[in-house]
């Protein structure tokens, strides 16, 4: 039976349900409007009142474009105090840079339109390039990048307004700076009135952030310890949560002030959870090897599992952190004692000696797992009770990608220059307004990895603003002559935008709506916005966003396959640098960089088939673990207790691994063979070694080498740089082998 027949029979049986399905679904989608979250409804009301106050003061001061004061309030206002202050600080910085740059541009090129457009485009591109280098993720919530965005569009509005009247550029720029500063000061001041008990609430939020991340991580590790299938299925969500919460720690630091280093400790604790997961993945790899598990290991694994599962409840209670750390230290000592007792027991044959070695490697992995958890808990305790003379610092890491920065810069510069050519060639009277909107869009979105999608959502919000402003200007406020009427109707429209901003699926369209609505309303002391002014503003707005969206799709568009290839090349190059000994990498830097790659790939996967994304995610995690074990081997090579023969074997594997240098010269096969040869030589060294300390060092080296060899073998297609990884020509069997 066809789908059409099934639909007809269903409609005949229950026609009322079919009719009501559409309206019910629509009503549920509008729940953000008629049943909003009370906290976010308060945010929308507070920001609306602040915006109207800024607009009223700007009108009272008789500023030339008072709508920018109201617009700035909506640009700076965020759901939390920390976000608002962080964004306000960087917005103010960007405004100062943009004003100075705009004055310089107009003063240098007052009567050369083509050169003016060229330098305007170069300036926007430069700000985008600098923004790409800012620490943190390339997202709309990164307010360091927002500082460069603010520089870009302030540079544009000052220079575009000033080029029409270059003799008064200083007065124009001071006017623009005044209403932007007015909006920032009002929003920061009024939002502070509603933040009672902020410090206590923020410290509680930092604690809950850590606990909410640690609990699923410990649950996954507990599954690994008992050999549960699919125990690490939710590791992707945990890494994404670590990245998101790590970004939010910065705003908690702003709310707490710079009196202590609680935020630094919280950021380090979240990073240690990522290290904990990496150690758990190493343990899972070793547990799959033959002769690795015995009854004693299973008993210890069960004891550690029980400890991990009970840990979240113990953190929520009043139990001291010292007792928890003492229990973990006891478990660690038991693992060490098990290895020492095996050292003192004579083994009857080589098979028994091999089994003892495997057990020792598992015990070493358990020790490293416990150490990672102890480090995370220590940092968590320091974030809850920071010391008075604490100088600990865990910075937000940034990874400069020159290729991405140049791409972002060219994309924005060419788009702005093209808009300028359209204005020069057509002599459009509203051409400067058109260029201004294009500059705003390029400044906001060119630092994102997928600007076309963001611009599309921005266009929808702008269209809603056009409709709302049309109703206000042409119908509701057509005859109003008082600020009270203006405030009543525009405040109602702004309130709707504030409620939409609090609803995640509508956040970006709501930003556009709140940004452009005051511009389209165009309040002024001298005149009202009639239909001519309204359409001459709305048309450049819509056309500017359409043009920018089109340019993002045709000029240097986002290519997910290229991003995956680039990530893979960088991972192979990092392996080369770490093995070569030239990279000044640490465990935290390796984990944070690869977790960032992991989350970026998940975020930007788009319509890519799930098996391809899953295989790349597995490859990134595998590469991260190989890097961590290479760092450990580098440390072991510097240990004076390592005998010369073992040191020579490690030097050989490092030399081979250093050939992972790019796309076409992988030397994968020789590297894998060298790794297995080094394992055999170190096993011989361990078999001939009687001193316990030296045997511990050899077992640690063998643990790392076994993990590296297993990862190289399991993810052959990812690490073999000569292969076209996940090319459409690959067979399903080859694709499955990558996972």
Curated annotation (Swiss-Prot):
Which InterPro entries does the entry mention?
A: PHBA_efflux_AaeB/fusaric-R
This protein's GO CC annotations: plasma membrane
Cell membrane is among the record's keywords: yes
The UniProt keywords, alphabetically, are: Cell membrane, Membrane, Transmembrane, Transmembrane helix, Transport
Kindly report the protein's main subcellular placement as a broad class.
Answer: membrane
The entry's localization annotation reads: Cell membrane
Membrane topology per record: Multi-pass membrane protein
| Gene Ontology molecular function terms on file | transmembrane transporter activity
Q: What Pfam families would the database entry show?
A: FUSC
Q: From the record, give the transmembrane residue ranges.
A: 53-73, 90-110, 114-134, 178-198, 421-441, 457-477, 491-511, 532-552
What family does the entry list? Belongs to the aromatic acid exporter ArAE (TC 2.A.85) family.
**What is the name of the protein in this document?**
Uncharacterized transporter GOX0755
Q: Which organism is it from?
A: Gluconobacter oxydans (strain 621H) (Gluconobacter suboxydans)
- Supply the source organism's classification: Bacteria, Pseudomonadati, Pseudomonadota, Alphaproteobacteria, Acetobacterales
């Amino acid at each position: 039976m066809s789908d059409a027949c099934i639909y007809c029979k269903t409609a005949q049986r229950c026609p009322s349900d079919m009719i009501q399905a559409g309206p019910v679904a629509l009503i549920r989608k509008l729940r953000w409007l008629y049943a909003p979250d009370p906290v976010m409804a308060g945010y929308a009301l507070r920001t609306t009142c602040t915006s109207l106050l800024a607009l009223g003061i700007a009108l009272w001061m008789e500023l030339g474009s008072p709508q920018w004061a109201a617009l700035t309030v909506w640009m700076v206002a965020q759901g939390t105090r920390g976000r608002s202050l962080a964004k306000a600080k960087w917005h103010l910085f960007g405004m100062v840079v943009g004003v100075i740059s705009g004055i310089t541009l107009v003063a240098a090129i007052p009567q050369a339109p083509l050169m003016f457009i060229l330098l305007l485009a170069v300036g926007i591109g430069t700000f985008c390039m600098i923004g790409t280098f800012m620490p943190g993720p390339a997202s709309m919530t990164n307010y360091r990048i927002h500082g460069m965005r603010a520089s870009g569009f302030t540079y544009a509005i000052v220079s575009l307004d000033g080029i029409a009247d270059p003799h008064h550029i200083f007065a124009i720029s001071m006017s623009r700076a005044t209403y932007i500063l007015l909006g920032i000061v009002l929003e920061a001041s009024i939002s502070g009135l509603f933040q009672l008990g902020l410090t206590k609430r923020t410290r509680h939020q930092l604690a809950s952030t850590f606990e909410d991340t640690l609990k699923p991580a410990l649950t996954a590790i507990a599954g690994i310890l008992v050999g549960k299938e699919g125990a690490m299925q939710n590791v992707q969500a945990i890494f994404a949560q670590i990245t998101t919460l790590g970004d939010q720690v910065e705003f908690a630091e702003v709310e707490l002030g710079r009196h202590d280093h609680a935020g630094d400790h919280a950021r380090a604790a979240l990073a240690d959870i990522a290290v904990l997961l990496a150690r758990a993945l190493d343990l899972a790899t070793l547990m799959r090897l033959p002769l690795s598990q015995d009854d004693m290991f299973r008993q210890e694994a069960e004891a550690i599992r029980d400890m991990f599962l009970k840990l979240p409840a113990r953190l929520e209670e009043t139990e001291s952190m010292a007792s928890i750390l003492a229990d973990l230290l006891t478990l660690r000592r038991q693992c060490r004692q098990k290895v020492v007792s095996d050292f003192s027991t004579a083994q009857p044959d080589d098979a028994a000696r091999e089994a003892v070695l495997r057990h020792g490697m598992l015990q070493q992995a358990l020790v490293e797992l416990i150490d990672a958890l102890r480090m995370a808990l220590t940092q968590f305790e320091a974030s809850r009770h920071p010391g008075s003379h604490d100088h600990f610092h865990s910075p937000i890491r940034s990874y400069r990608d020159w290729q991405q920065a140049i791409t972002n810069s060219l994309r924005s510069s060419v788009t702005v220059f093209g808009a300028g050519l359209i204005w020069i060639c057509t002599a459009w009277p509203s051409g400067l307004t058109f260029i201004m909107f294009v500059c705003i869009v390029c400044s906001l979105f060119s630092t994102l990895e997928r600007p076309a999608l963001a611009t599309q959502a921005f266009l929808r919000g702008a269209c809603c603003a056009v409709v709302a402003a049309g109703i206000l200007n042409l119908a509701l406020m057509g005859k109003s002559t008082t600020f009270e009427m203006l405030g009543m109707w525009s405040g109602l429209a702004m309130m709707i935008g504030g409620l939409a901003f609090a609803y995640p699926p509508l956040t970006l369209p709501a930003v556009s709506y709140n940004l452009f609505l005051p511009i389209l309303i165009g309040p002024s002391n001298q005149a009202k916005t009639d239909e001519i002014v309204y359409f001459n503003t709305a048309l450049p707005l819509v056309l500017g966003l359409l043009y920018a969206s089109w340019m993002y799709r045709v000029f240097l568009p986002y290519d997910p396959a290229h991003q995956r290839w680039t990530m893979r090349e960088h991972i192979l190059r990092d392996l080369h640098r770490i093995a070569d000994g030239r990279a000044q990498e640490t465990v935290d830097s390796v984990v944070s960089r690869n977790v960032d790659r992991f989350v970026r790939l998940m975020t930007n996967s788009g319509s890519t088939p799930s098996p391809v994304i899953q295989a790349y995610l597995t490859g990134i995690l595998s590469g991260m673990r190989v890097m961590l074990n290479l760092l450990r081997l580098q440390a072991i090579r510097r240990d004076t207790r390592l005998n010369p023969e073992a040191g020579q074997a490690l030097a050989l594997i490092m030399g081979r691994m250093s050939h992972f240098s790019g796309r076409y010269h992988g030397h994968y096969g020789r590297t894998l063979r060298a790794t297995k040869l080094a394992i055999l030589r170190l096993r011989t060294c361990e078999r001939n070694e009687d001193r316990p300390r030296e045997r511990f060092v050899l077992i640690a080296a063998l643990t790392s080498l076994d993990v590296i060899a297993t990862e190289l073998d399991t993810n052959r297609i990812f690490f073999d740089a000569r292969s076209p990884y996940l090319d459409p020509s690959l067979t399903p069997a080859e694709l499955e082998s990558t996972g």
